[in-house]
Structure formats: structure tokens, C-alpha cells
């Protein structure tokens, strides 16, 4: 053919008109009778609009979208081809859904048919051939020729590569259409998408590796390691013949064989094929390279992968005592093939397992059987049972593995998850992922069989009508496991249905496995019983010692004291008995799956515990003070050794503990015993712990063990010394005094007057101390965490470069540090130790073996600075000041430092030289002392020389310039510069040089304008003449030598005649054609850059000392520089580095801010306005980069998209995260370039080489693709595409912008099966091609994946599309930086470091919180989070060895985790904090988690109080669920004692300590309330003289430590001190207190304790979306009330009432100072809990806003609720939702709730006896009469409410009279009582304090018993009363706000402390707040 196809613009051949019938099946087609037929009405004009190919019905999109896209692509040049493609799409759609039952199918068919009718006649006329078949062949062959002609080219640029890809896509689609038309098979044959694509010649969509024939010429396929890996996978020699599997062609590779053998999906096979090839290639390249060892490296790579993939499987087999089924032949080549097949089989199982991936041992079970079948198939083994060849039980059929293996187990998981009832059901009622997986830890799992027996108990799912006797229990029945044809499988609508017949009697629900998650605070004791027993026994010992007044530890060995102390073992026995009872109670519901030996052991242990509980007390009581003594000859404190029978018993009792102690000191032996499967060791370990698959062998090395043991010994010694001296010992004497006092006259009716020793008073005094005793270890941990974390940071060079000044001072060491850390070393350099930290590097030099090392640093530095400019952190001027010139001089070691280092240095040198008097050597040393000054002087001199050499071209002028230069250099050599030159004239010369260079710069800009150029030429000549005269006349002492040269020229001219002398030009002046200076200068970028740099060197002043001005740029540069001095692994070459992926889950969060969102002002100020004020410098830089002056100019220039990006990159958006993570790819390409490029390429520049050197650029892309993959799991992308959501387009735009980005999503669509729509789910991976999303892989799922917490399943479905050996988890509100991405290959080398016994499996990274720069709350939150992710995790990793996974930027050993359950857990509710469970799981499975501080990732946090509180609530909920989880229980039981302490205090212990610190306040206050109201306090003061108890003051002080946030405050200050300096840290800490940080932390304490405690008791944990809004906005009063009413306001009022009552009735003999100290923190807490939401609410004291809030509050409180009314609209709806946690509560939790509510009745009981009206009567009748008053009050309230219902609408006047009557009656009663019974005003106040808590207590009790009273009038009255209470509390809270709002100064003060950080940065907060008020 003579015409060439251009793919973007399809072929244009002169058209010839032919007539043609409508395309359809041929006449002889069997489908003709049933095919679609319709007459088309022809029209004359074709539509110019492309048909919408994106919004298609979900049921059809995957099958027809490619045809419609290609039609749109070729329509302009080949309209008939477009028509045929659309008609073909229509036929497929009609065949798939003939009755149009799918959603949207009918509409789609109608619109497409209309388009076909419109296009038919016009396209026939435009047809160029006689028939449609010929037309198709013509275009198809044209594209085919283009592909053949250009497909082999290797050096295509991007545009040519895109054209070739488009050509392949078009040819592939045309091939399908042509094949259908010519074969006449009808659309039925083409409906199977996969089979047609398999036949396509040209284009198969691929992810990274184009494994089809068309991809062999791509650069990545030419890498030797890829070729080797492909060869391994394609080695099909020796496989069974394909005919055995109904295949007529040889197998393409091993994966195709596995697919046909076991029935895997095509998409899964294609995905895992590429997966394994990439894994193999990356492993091969890292093998030691030897000559002729390519096959050997392949063997070693496969062996390495085998070891990683099957480590868990082989351990599982060993644990169960089964031989593994990985059987290898002896022939080496065959063994390699077998190994590859086993790895491929596991990957295919894993890739299709869907939610079963959370169950790793379930996958082991499946693989175990399939590996056996695979071996049988490969060897041709014959079954002993059937006598036939071994065949896969589930093989052969289409998708048979999914249907027959995965789906039955998935259905069990799904049905069990449904029983969770959205988190309200008790955990014991359903099996979660762990329960189902742990069933495979026992040999009983093999009873399931293979093929699996559907009647097995494992598949039995309890009915939803739970567990009533005789109830039918449902069981999932699955179809019989037989091979079926594809059609039969498609006809099966249900893979599992509930059997309608009664199951067999033996079928039963197995219940929980190994553990039951029970909601109880006892779970904390059970999980950490050793710790609690230790603290209880220590407390008992300390009390005994205090009673004996022990002052020295040696006194304990006094016989009597020692014997008393030994009584602690009686307590120990009791505690073990309690533990044994709890174990049986808590595991009762797991008894069905518990081995019989385990049941026996539990009973035996309980029996032994009961026996010791009896024996020890009996022996102790009988042998007390009865000793048998022995005397020794040693004169020591052991000179007399006495013992008793009790001591002998204790010795026997402690035998087991002694063995544990010995094993503790030899961790290797204990680890071997735990992990060994030998029978003896099984027996030895059987008694201690239940034999579980996980939790064994977690011991650390002796060095690590010593470090954390030493840490905890210090903590415990400090804690016990403090507790003994300040808490316990001071309490002994007051206790004895209290016990001696006899109380006769109580001030109330004492219920137990006969109790001796004032036991209640002793409890009231001791209880707060006990609470603090159990809590204050957390405080001491925080103190030592600060000390050790700070010491560790100093030793690891943290904060070595903190400021710009320090950066400038150390900048000369950065090149050497950079090359030592980030540049791969040659073989010679690998042995050389890198210099670190405090030792200087070679100034500006790399290693001797790499002369270009400095050039590499310069190139990377400039890339980093350019990225700053791209991100608008710096301006164009700052860019010039910070970049370093890259020229050939760098290779010779001449360094040209960035100008911001040299700022003011040259002018300072001039000032020094100008007035200097002395010798040259002294001046030289003075200038040389400042290296940057020396470099500045030297560079200015060399630059001036260089410019003059180019500028001056006249012979005489050149001689003069050379003469001057020679004079200068000669004087320097002879040290006579000060003698030969007058330095005083240097400033004048400086000014003239500036003038000269400015003219040169101006000339280069104006060189196109001739007239302007001539004018500048004249000025330039004059400037040169001025310089010449200044130097020769004023500066040079012997300037006459230079003048002689000039005069000699003039003298030589006399011989030529007077005429010639007259016309001779002046020096530097041009005449005619003769030019003395070359101006304009040559058009050279490097020359222009050098002139510009010279000008900056001459002109830049002190202002450049603050470059860069942007704070974030400063921080990033400082950290990057500091990290170069930290200990990090050597960098490998990119080709040898570990490959990795990044995975980001995304739900419905912002991707990019839309234009409307940017400018919308509905709820507050617009986002763009906010951004302009918060980031003013970055906005200015952005405008400069865009070349615009303001926002309006941007809009006029059409740069709205750039504006959207700029704003989105400053919010918490997905686009920001994607941009940051794609820096990893950019960094890898640059590093690969540095690895491969020669010196000339480096000097040319990375970007220039990438554009010009296509083969090198293709190779860089190939390496980057092989090493890095980024997958974003957009859960809703499919639904968004279908609905036309703009978010879908935003995601597509991201893929187009970053071509290597991949998006995974779940598609839910309806498929028509037997004319019935059925929901089917697919996991899909897409990429962007030609502006559209193109599907790469499609894997069918067994059902909806989101049956758990959501986010883990979102990660789980996408993890199969990730690649590499490592996986980094990144949230969508994170950021990354180019300079940090350079360190990724160093970080990945950590996996190859073996620290201790195990290599790391999770690498922890530090985070920078980037949202703390504006509001004070955001500042507090960022500092709090920063301290946790730095100093906190630093200590957790080393020395404590208990760092887990906390989400965000951690890097996983990918293969380790995909074979052990994934990177998170997903069971509903219990795994609410899904991330941390990955860390628990890793630790329990003997993984190792480290923390690395040399690399950081950005992280966003919430910035408003409400958002922060929701986040805190979510974390507290998650921690409460962790408390009752099996993971925490096993860690607590399996760790050694000191590591267990670390685990507790760094996980749930922090929250439990916070809870008991608050409980301690309640105990103290209620204890004091008891003492005051009962009259005991008065008696104790008067008779026992008990006044101030120091221990109580200590207890309250300890509580205040937690309350005021010092647990996080101390580490925070230390970390700030390390990174910014301790003076700044102290200043920040003081400033935080002035900004009410104590209020914030006290308020946060209330949030944590409320949600932690409530969730443990009642459940109700749920994910709480915070919104992550970028704008800090005002929250209205009703919103604050809903959020904080029950968590803070109620408790705040309760504390305040307690304090008021105590203040009213306390006895004044107490010291006022002591009382103030004790109660201050409580007053502060109550005030904070009531007021903080309003103090931290922007514009919270603005009158206009206050008025609006009051209206909204009244509307909300009065609105009636109902079905569908949200809680933000109605008080009643909110009130009902607020009790949701009680609906799923058990009887025990409800009873405890009632018991806790009884505390509100204490007020009434105590206060009624202190009324004047009672006249000191303490009879119980007084209390009874008080209830009469309460009932009368309730009756009155009910009467008024009833009257409102009856009369308020129609008989309003009657209702008013009724209210007047009630009011008068109450007033009359009060007056009567005042006159007759002496009722006083104080009585009325006290009555309110007494009766209000009682009413609230009744409401709480009614809520607890709601199921019993709901629907009765009592419940209706409860609602009325609760509304009244809420209204009253709202009024009390609102009144002070309204009063303060009248004072303008309050609002100004609030704005100042809320936004102080912004004021410090001079940001414009007032316009933002003003904008908010305006837009309300």
C-alpha cells in the first residue's frame, strides 16, 4: 500500500462510494433467526460529536468500551470504520442482555441505535472500498504495516511511542471486528472477551512487562535479568501434554499450564505471571555475579524466593506434624521447573483468594492439597483408590478454583460477618477472620478433606435467630464438587445456599477458636496478669515495710519483717486462682475447638491454684514466728539463717517461677524449647502456655534483652522508691490514728454504725493512693522515655544541623557526606568506613575512585532546589541563589558554591581589604579563615577574567587586560599586592564592575533590537574605559607600565602620518568593521548563567543570609543535611536495589479541589482565599511562576487547572500524596542516570540527556518500572465512573499526569444469568492510555470484598497488583519529598541487614506533621504527634523492642506479609485500628520491626477541636478493642516480663492509666464527700488531729501530671530541644501554656477516658470520619453540645457539684494552702471540660454568631425525632443515637452501668440531713420524705407536660391558668414550710444540689433498663425529663458565652491565642475570620 498510516490521525485515502448492506451475521449463520434485526432510517449528515464511550452500563462496559473508544479515535478520518466498531459493540451488548434487564442498558441501546441510524448513509458514502469487509481489511493492513515498520525501533521518543501504542490498540480492535465479520460466527463467539484477546496479534494491555509479541522491542524486555526470568517461566519442557487438559496448542509458559490444570482466572494468571517474572528478575540481579553463572544465578534466585514464600507453609506443616508437599526431583533442571511451578501455584492461589488472604494458614491448607495434586500431575502418579492418574479435584473448568475452593470458604466468612450486626453483636456470637484461620492450626482441619466436605462443622453457620434451645441452625451447603462445563458453571446462580432440610445431628457451629473477645475490664488483668500480680505483691510488701518503719532495704531481712513480707505469696496464690477462674470463664465459648489436653490442663491448673490458696494460708498461720535456725561462720547479714514450714512451701511454690527465671537469662534455650516440635519439648512447654502456632520464639538477643531489662529496672526502682517514700509510708500513721478514733455521733443516718476501726474512712483515704500507685508507672515511663530517647537522638546525630546558619557552616561537608551515603561505592571503596557526624569530610571531594562525585552532588542538589521551585517554596531569585553551576570545572575539583552561602562575603572582603594595613600574608589568612569568603573572592576574580577574555577582542586591549592581570598575579605570588595596589579604591572598582555586568545582562536580553544594542555598546565602552582609568591611575602604584603599552601604540601611529592618527579610535572603542569588544556576547546558556551568577555575587547583600525564606524549605533542607550524617546502609546501584511498591487506599476523600470548591463561600471563607492568607509567600511564588500578577490574571490566562493543583497540593488531598510518592520514581530515574552516565552526560544535565538520548531515557524508564510501582486503591472509582462523579475524572487526570500510576478498584455490576440480573464483583487494575483509563487485569471476586472494617479490604483487593519485595503503606493525607526519595534505596537495604537474630520485616519511618503551622490547636496536635512518631517510636524500637505498626509510611517486607495474613487485619469492630494489628501479627510471627530516622514522610492531621476529638475518640475506641483482642492477650502472655511491661505501657496501658487517673479523682472526691457529709471528717480533725495527709497531695499531683498533658509534654520538649535547640524548646513550651495548651490536653484526657472506658464496657466502636477540612471553621453550639455532652459536660458538672458540696460542708480547720493545692487540678479539669469547646471555637465569642447559635440550639432541642430525621436536626434523634452503645450491651455491662449510676444518689442521701428544716434529725424517715418531694416534683413536671399536650394548641388560655396555678401552689408550699418548719434559702440551694443528681441517676438507670420499660409511660416521662436536663445544661453553658460576647476584648483575645502561630508568621487571620462572619 502506498499510503502510510499515522495512528493519531488515521489514514486518509481518496474515498469511493460503494453500496453495502447493513453489517450483521451472514445468511448461513445459525444465529440469524434470533439475531437483532431492525430497519434503519438513513439520514444525510453524520454527527460530528463523538459517542460517549465512558458512561456505560456497568454490565456492558468491560466488553464494549474499547470498540466505542476506537470508533471515536478513528471517526474523523475513517467514519465507516467507526460505524462498524459501534455496530459491533451494539451486537455484543444485545447478545449479552437481550431483554435490557440491566440498569441503564435500555437507555444505552436506544442512544447507540439512534447514533447508528444517524451515521449509516453518510458513512457508506465515505467508504473507500466496495464492501465493509474490504474496508476493514484495508485499514487493518495499513495499521499492521505501520506496526511492522516502526515496532522494532528502540529509540522512539514519547510521541512516537504513543503513536505506536495507539496503532496497536486500533489494529487489535479492528482484528476482532474483522474476525467476526469474516468468520460469520456471530456475536456469540465474540462475547467471550478473554478468548478474543488471546488471539489478538498486536496489542495486549499490560502493566509493566509487555509479554506479548509486540512488546519484545521495549527497553525493559532487553534487560538481561528480565530475559533470564522470562526464560525460567517459559521453560515448559517436560510438562504433561496439553491434550490432557483439553488444549490443542503447547503451553506458552508454566502459568498457562497451572491455569488449565486448576482452573484459575485469566486475569489472575496474567497478573501473577508478571509478578513472578519481576520478583525473579530483581532477585537474579542481586545474586553474586560470577563468570558463566547466569543459570546458577537463576537457580539461586528461585531458591531464595522458595525460602521466602514457603517459610510459613513449612513451619505450619512442622507445627501440625505433617510432611510438606513440596517434592522436588533430583535432576537440577527439573527441580528448577518444579520450584517455579510451586511458587506460581502459591501466587495464583493467593491472587484469587480475595478475603481469604487474611487467613494465611487457610491458604497453606489449600496449597498443601493442590501442591500434592500438582506433583501427581507432573509425575503422572496413579491414584491408589481409583487406579487412574492423579487429577486436580477442582481443575479443568472455567473459574473452577474460584467457584469450588474460594467461594465456599468465603461464604462462611461472609455469613459470619453478617452476624456481627454492624458492630452491635457480641464478639462471642460470630467467628471473625482469626477464628476461621486458627481452625487450621489444629489437625482437625484435615477433616475438611479434599475435595472439601460441605457437611463439615467448619461450614456450619449459626442461624441468625441465635441459640435458643431447639432452634434450627443453618448450614451452608455447597454443590457437589464435580467438573462442569463452562455453560453449566455460568448457569449456577448460587454457589452456596441454605439447606432447607434438617442438617445431620453431628453438624454444629464450632464457635470461637482459641480465644473469645469478652468485654470486661478483667481482660486487662488476664492479659497482663504477671504485671498486675507484681504490682499487687509489691504494694503489699511496701505496706508491710512501711508498717515496720523500714528505712533501709537490708532491714527487710530481719526475721519478723521478712516473714511478714513473705505473706505476699498467699496473695500470689489467690491471684493465680482468680486468673485460673477467669481463663475458664473467658474461654468457655471456645470450648468446642479447644483440644481435650488443653481442657484438662486448665482444670488441673485451677486445682493446683486452689490447693496453694489453701495450703499457704494454713501453713502461714500455724508456723508464724516458729523458725528452725542455722548459724554460719560468716559474719554477715546471713550469719543466722532461719526458715519455717511456710518458707519451705513457698520455695516449692516458686519452683516454676525459678525455672522461668533461668530460661529468661538464656533466651536461646527458651526459644528453642518453644519452637521445637520434639515431643519432650512439647511436653515441657505444654504446662506454661497453650500450644499455638503464633507467639512462639519471640525472644530477643541477650544484648537487646539486657538493654530493655536495665531500662525497666531503673523505672521500677524509681517508682517503688517514690511510692514508698511519698505515698505509702506517710499514710501509715494517719491510718493508725483513724483506727483508734471511736465515732459515736454521725451527721447522717449511718447504715453500718457497728463497723469497727472506721473502715469506710480508711477506704476513703487509701483508695485514691492505691489508684495512683497503679497509675504512676506510666509517669515514670514517660520520664525515662524522655531521658533515653534524648540520649539516643544525640548519639545518632539528630538535630546536628538545626538552623540555616548551621547549614551554611556545614555545607562544605555535604558533598562528601552525600557521596558517602547516597552514591554507590566501587568495590575498592566498600571496605572504607564512612566518616560520620562530628568528624570532617574532605572538603568538596568525593572518593578517590570517583572523580565525578562532586558533579553528582551538584546535579542532585540542583534537582532538589528545582523541586522546591516547582512546589513554589522558593522564588526565581532564590532559585538562582541556591543552585550550583554544573561545568567541567567540577570534575577537576573546582567548586562553585551556591550564592546564598556567599552572600555578603565579597563585599565583606572588600571592606576588610579597603582599610587593611599590614602584610599580604595576614590579609590572605584573614580572608582564607572564612572559606566561603575566600571562594567568593576567588570566583569573582576568575569570573571577571573569563568575561573580559570573551568580551575584549582588540589586540591592544587584550594586551592591556593581560598586562593588568599579570601585574595582579605577580604581586600575589610575591606577596606584594598591598604594596603594588591601593586597596582603598576597591569599592569604586566594585561599583564599576557592577555597572559593566549589568550592561552585559541587559545586552543579552535586548540583543534583537539594533538601536538599543548600539546604545548599550557605547555605555559598555565607557564603562570599560572607566575601569581602565580607575585601575591604572588610582589603584596601581606602577600603572605607568600599562600606560606605556597604550602610548606605544599611539607612538607607532606617528609614522603613518598625521591623518591616520587623527581618525584612530579610543581604547575599547570600535571603528567601522573593526571591533575591539565582542558585544553582544555569544548566545550561550552557560555564559549567560555565569554572567548572571557574577552579577549576583557582586550585588547580593545581607538579605541572602535568610535564603530560603520559606519555613518548610528551611526545615526540609536542614533535615536532609542532618540525615546525611546519620547511620544508613550503603546505597546500591538502582539496578541492584530491592524493588518496592507503594499502596494508598482511597475512599471518598478529596482528590483535587474543584474550581467551585476553591471559590465557594457557603460555610466559611473560600479555600483559595484561605490559602492566599495562610501561604502568602508560596502564593507570590506561584504567581511569579505563572507570569501573572493576581488571581484575576490567572483566570484570564486560562490557568485554572494550575490554580486547582496549587491549592490541592496544600490541602490533605490525594493529588498531593500522589505527587509526593511519584518523587520516588523521579529519584530512581535520576539515580539510575548517575549510575550509568559518563562525565559528559552528567555535565550536560539529566533533563537534557533524557530528552536527547532516547535509548538511555528508555533504559531509565525501564529500571524505574522494574523497581517502583505505585497503586492507589480507589474503592469508589467504579461507582464514580458509572455515576459521572467528577472525582472519577480527577483520578483519571492523575493517571494521565503520572503514566506509571496504577489505580485498583472494585467493580460491582450485574450480569445477566438466565435472564436474571446477578451482582458480580471484580477487582480491576487500570492505567491511563491515550487519555482514557485502560483495563489491565480483571479478577473476579467471590462476593463483595468489604465485609469487615473497609479500609483493610480496600488494601487487600489491591495488594495483588503491587510488585516488588517491599511494600510501603501510605495514607491519602500524606506527602513525600524529592530529597527524601533519594534515600529510599538506602532504606530498603535495611531488609538485608541482620540486626540480632532476625532481619527486619517492617521498617518504621518518622513523620513530619505539615498541618501545624496556623492554628494553635493544630500546633499542639502536630507537636504531640511528632513526639510520638519520633522520640516515642525511637525508644519503642530500641531498646524496648516493642515497636509495632502504626500505619502511614512504614515499609513492609512484602513476601513475609503476603504469606502471613497481609498488612492489616479486617475483622469488624475488633480490628477498628486495623494498622496496629499488622505489627502485632508480625511480632507474634517472629518478625522484627525497626525504626529509621534518616528518612521522613509528610503527614496531615486535623486542625479543629471537633475533628481532633473525633480522631482521639476513634483511637481510644480502637485501643479499647485492642484491649480485649487475642493479639494483645498473646503478646502479654508470651513476652518475657520486662518486654511485657513495654508492650503494656506503650499500647493500651497509656489509655488505661489515663482512665484510672480520672477514676482516681472521682474516688478522692466521693471519699471526701463521704467524710464530710457523714461527719467523720470533723471527728478525725478534732479527735485524731488528722489534718493534711501528704499522700493525698502527692496523689493529686501525680494525677495532674497526666491531666496537664505532661506524659506527652516531656518527650515533646526533649524532641524539640534535640531538633531545634533547648532554648527554643523552652520558649515553645511556655508559649504553648500561654495559648492554653493545658486546657487542650486536659480536654483530650476526657475524650480518651470516656470512649476507652465506654467501649470496653458496651462496645459501639466505630470509624469516625473527621473530614480533614483545610479551613478552620466555627462549629455551632448545638454541634458542640451533641459531641461533648456525655463525654465532657456531664462529667464537668458532676465534678463541679462535688466541689461545691465539699466547699459548703468542709471543716475550715484544714490549711487553706493544702486545700487549694488538692482541689485546684479538679477545679481546672471541671472548668476545662465545660468551657474548652467554646474557647477553642473560632469566632466563639462574636455576638452575631452567638445569636445565630442560640436560634439553632432552640430549634434543635425542641424538634421531635422520628424515622429518617438525622440527629443534627432533632434532639430526640440524637438522644436515641447516643444510647446506641447500650443496645448491644450484655446483662453484666447494664448492671455495672446501674451500679455506677447509684453514685448520684449519694448527694441526696447526705445532703437532706444537712438541711435546716430537718433540725439535725438523722432518722431514716427524713430520707424517705425526700423521695416524696422528688415524686411530687416528677408529678408536677408530668402534669405540665400533659397539660401542654392537651391544652396548648386549642385551649391556650386554660393552659396558662394551669401553669399559674402550679406556680402559685409551689410558692405557697415553700412559704408555708419557711414559716412553720424553718425552711431557709440555703435549704433551697442544697435541695437543688441534692435532687438534680438524683434525677440524672434515674435517667441513666432508665436508659440501662430501656428494653424493659420502652413503650410504657415511664419511658415517655424519662424522655421528657432528659430533654429538660439537656435544655437546662445548655442554658447554663450558653449564658457565660453570651455575657462574654458583649466584651469585644474577649473575642480579640480568643483570636490571638487560637492563631498565635499565624500571628508570629505575620499571616492575615483577621481577613479570614471577617470573611467567615460575612458569609454566615
From Swiss-Prot:
Q: What is this protein called?
A: Putative callose synthase 8
- Gene Ontology CC: one annotated term: plasma membrane
Extracellular face: residue ranges? Answer: 552-565, 624-648, 729-759, 1566-1595, 1642-1688, 1737-1790, 1841-1856, 1906-1928
Coiled-coil positions are: none
**Molecular function GO terms recorded:** 1,3-beta-D-glucan synthase activity
InterPro entries from the UniProt entry:
FKS1-like_dom1, Glyco_trans_48_dom, Vta1/CALS_N, Vta1/CALS_N_sf
Give the lineage.
Eukaryota, Viridiplantae, Streptophyta, Embryophyta, Tracheophyta
| Record's keyword terms, sorted | Cell membrane, Cell shape, Cell wall biogenesis/degradation, Glycoprotein, Glycosyltransferase, Membrane, Transferase, Transmembrane, Transmembrane helix
Its gene name is CALS8
